[in-house]
């Protein structure tokens, strides 16, 4: 049935008349797809661009994550796990990095809604946070699919998506009652590595026929920490191993189908994540022996995050098109033992007293999709967003005590510095999915954002898909994307200090203070990609070139703004110079035996990833990565797979940036290495599904060291097993 078509004036009138309704990017339920979709919108068309990957629930079952969804997301093209800088600090708290832009430029969504709990954790002088990121709030068994958007396709999501977007879609309510219980265990062969055990449940069904349905899930997980001496026993370093974590999650979704075309969802989630301390002290990758307090805390909980969120999401289908609306709230309490804020002891636990940082986020969004014909078939999208984030962190804002020191721009007395900071960001965007001629699709877009501190920002984009016959498609995109300053960088109350060794190496003498800066500009990246795809009878191949020209990256300052009353240097967070990230991504699918044996491969080759000022990489990532899997469907009940990942060499920083690094930096590289895994899944009967496997079959282990590129532990051989009981 052909969708209703309208002239351009009529279309604009319909959209403008509806501006007061809010929106969400939340997904429609599978059961409502046929009634909810008008025709392909710009958002849906962008998911066909070369920088987009989809991970299904079936994919997750074949390679189950140990605890964090990042375990499988990292196997997508252009994706790695790394820290937010090349310093090696917090090296085992690796997070999702897309196209070398760093974890802070990866936007995590759950059901289309941004998740920002990691922003409640203090941002260090070197640009790291003591956090596991935001990819561990949903257990693997509750995921319907994961969408990974890289490059220009992610620009529509606004601030924080300069690298890309990870959208975790949870399972929807069903029209008949269903439930499941799942159990998973991962047992490392090396007794110095932590074990994992997880259990969760899911219950879904109708409360009032198809008109009112619900879904409820709960999860509990425990991963033990690595042994305190896992690295010391190998190389003599004090670098800590991977810390453990305890997860407790509960999530409810109530879906009301008011009419076949009008759906209202209410969601609520509560999670608690607590660590099990392994001895990390931010700079434990240096030759700094932990103090007695740190030693005594091994195996204890030293920080915990409480995340609470609710949302109201509306989806409607009208004669003129489709509308979406949403209101969301998220609150994170970050409770942890207090840490130092000065020089080499920054980030080291120095007290047995707990303090709490609180981050609250309010969001409203609205979107309208209207199909019409004006010179060509097209679907116009108009969207609006309003975001307000508020941080209150007394421990971090008041940690540096320089009482008696006069510091222009702030106060040395911690009691005189504000513990709070907030930011409001309002955005409006316009997109159009245009079928210019058969086989040619254009997706122009423009986004305008207004920030209460730095003012306005424009983000234009253009994506193209051009058919070159029945088998080959050329796709390209370019977009200007941005990232707003975080609430620590822009806070007048956030003060860090160093006695001298941590000062920039351009400052010859004296101590340094680093002040927050409310006058920062947003970070900007011009993201470009062009790719070609081939599809024929189940065979598929593609290659994509990408380049991000990055400027205004916010860094700890190197320019002396003035001096304190005792002659110490005053610095502040500043917009730095330029950087460039460039690379190639490829994929190959071969149906060796149709419906029986398939071979999938993807690869990433980084051509450049460096600061144009220092030459240092933005983060430590492999030169190349290859992921391949041979998937065998033995029969209707049994399947098996072999997977192999090859990581290229990893180079450390080569250029000194702070005073105590004036000498030659360690040049130790991580050489190329590979990881092999095997897995099997068996549907025992209608209600019982089993899976088991071995990860890192050939036991290739890496140990974290004091310096160089060895900033993390690569765990060795482990055995996993899981069972799901359905009813």
Specify the residue positions occupied by each region the protein language model found.
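Face-selective signature of the C-terminal outer-membrane beta-barrel domain
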Residues: 255-273, 298-455, 465-469, 596-602
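N-terminal Sec signal peptide and the immediately downstream disordered periplasmic leader
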Residues: 1-66, 70-78, 199, 204-205, ...
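Surface-exposed extracellular loop regions of Gram-negative outer-membrane beta-barrel proteins
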Residues: 274-276, 452-454, 470-528, 545-571, ...
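Gram-negative outer-membrane beta-barrel transporters
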Residues: 182, 435-439, 545-550, 561, ...
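Periplasmic-side early beta-strands and strand-to-turn transitions of outer-membrane beta-barrels
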Residues: 174-297, 552, 649
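C-terminal beta-signal and adjacent terminal beta-strands/loops
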Residues: 116-121, 551, 556, 646-657, ...
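Acidic, small-polar-rich N-terminal luminal/periplasmic segments of exported/outer-membrane proteins
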Residues: 31-176, 530, 708
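Outer membrane beta-barrel strand-and-loop segments of large Gram-negative receptors
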Residues: 351, 361-370, 417, 421, ...
């Amino acid at each position: 049935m052909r969708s209703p078509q309208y002239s351009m004036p009529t279309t604009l009138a319909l959209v403008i008349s509806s501006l007061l309704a809010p929106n969400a990017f939340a997904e429609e339920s599978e059961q409502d797809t046929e009634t909810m979709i008008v025709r392909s919108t710009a958002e849906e068309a962008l998911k066909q661009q070369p920088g987009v990957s989809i991970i299904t629930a079936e994919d997750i079952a074949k390679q189950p994550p140990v605890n964090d969804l990042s375990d499988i997301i990292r196997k997508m093209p252009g994706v790695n796990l790394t820290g937010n800088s090349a310093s090696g600090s917090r090296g085992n708290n690796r997070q999702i990095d897309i196209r070398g832009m760093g974890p802070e430029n990866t936007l995590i969504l759950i059901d289309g809604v941004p998740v920002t709990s990691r922003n409640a954790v203090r941002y260090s002088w070197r640009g790291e946070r003591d956090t596991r990121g935001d990819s561990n709030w949903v257990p693997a068994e509750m995921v319907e699919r994961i969408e990974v958007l890289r490059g220009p396709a992610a620009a529509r999501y606004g601030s924080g998506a300069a690298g890309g977007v990870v959208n975790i879609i949870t399972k929807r309510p069903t029209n008949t009652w269903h439930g499941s219980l799942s159990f998973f265990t991962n047992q490392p062969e090396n007794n110095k590595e932590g074990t994992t055990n997880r259990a969760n449940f899911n219950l879904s069904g109708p409360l009032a026929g198809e008109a009112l349905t619900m879904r409820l899930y709960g999860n509990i997980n425990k991963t033990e920490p690595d042994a305190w001496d896992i690295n010391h026993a190998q190389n003599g370093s004090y670098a800590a191993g991977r810390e453990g974590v305890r997860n407790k999650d509960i999530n409810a979704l109530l879906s009301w189908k008011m009419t076949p075309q009008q759906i209202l969802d209410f969601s609520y989630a509560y999670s608690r994540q607590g660590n099990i301390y392994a001895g990390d002290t931010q700079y434990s990758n240096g030759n700094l022996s932990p103090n007695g307090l740190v030693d005594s805390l091994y195996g204890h909980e030293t920080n915990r995050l409480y995340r609470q969120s609710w949302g109201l999401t509306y989806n409607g289908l009208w004669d003129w098109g489709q509308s979406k609306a949403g209101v969301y709230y998220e609150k994170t309490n970050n409770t942890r033992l207090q840490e130092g804020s000065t020089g080499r002891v920054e980030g080291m636990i120095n007290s047995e007293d707990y303090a709490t940082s609180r981050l609250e986020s309010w969001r409203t969004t609205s979107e309208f999709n209207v199909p019409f014909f004006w010179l060509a078939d097209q679907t116009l999208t108009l969207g609006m967003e309003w975001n307000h984030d508020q941080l209150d962190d007394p421990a971090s804002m008041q940690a540096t005590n320089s009482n008696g020191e006069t510091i222009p721009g702030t106060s040395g007395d911690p009691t005189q510095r504000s513990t709070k900071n907030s930011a409001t960001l309002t955005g409006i965007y316009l997109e159009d999915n245009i079928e210019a001629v058969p086989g040619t699709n254009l997706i122009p877009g423009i986004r305008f954002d207004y920030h209460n501190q730095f003012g306005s920002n424009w983000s234009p984009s253009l994506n193209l898909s051009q058919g070159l016959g029945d088998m080959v498609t050329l796709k390209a995109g370019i977009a200007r994307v941005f990232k707003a300053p975080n609430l620590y960088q822009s806070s007048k109350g956030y003060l860090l200090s160093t006695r001298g060794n941590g000062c920039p190496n351009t400052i010859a003498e004296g101590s340094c203070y680093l002040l927050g800066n409310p006058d920062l500009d947003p970070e900007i990246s011009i993201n470009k990609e062009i790719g070609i795809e081939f599809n024929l009878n189940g065979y598929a191949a593609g290659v994509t070139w990408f380049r991000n020209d990055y400027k205004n990256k916010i860094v700890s300052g190197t320019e002396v703004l003035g001096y304190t009353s005792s002659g110490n240097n005053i610095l502040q967070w500043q917009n730095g110079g330029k950087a460039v990230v460039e690379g190639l991504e490829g994929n190959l699918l071969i149906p060796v035996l149709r419906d029986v044996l398939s071979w999938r491969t993807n690869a990433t080759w980084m051509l450049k990833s460096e600061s144009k000022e220092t030459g240092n990489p933005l983060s430590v990532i492999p030169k190349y990565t290859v992921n391949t899997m041979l998937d065998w469907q033995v029969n209707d009940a049994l399947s098996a797979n072999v997977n192999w990942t090859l990581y290229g060499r990893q180079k450390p920083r080569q250029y000194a940036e702070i005073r105590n690094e004036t000498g030659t930096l360690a040049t130790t590289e991580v050489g190329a290495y590979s990881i092999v895994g095997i897995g099997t899944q068996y549907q025992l009967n209608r209600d019982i599904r089993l899976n088991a496997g071995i990860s890192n079959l050939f036991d290739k282990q890496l140990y974290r060291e004091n310096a160089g590129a060895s900033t993390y532990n690569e765990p060795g051989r482990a055995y996993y097993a899981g069972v799901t009981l359905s009813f």
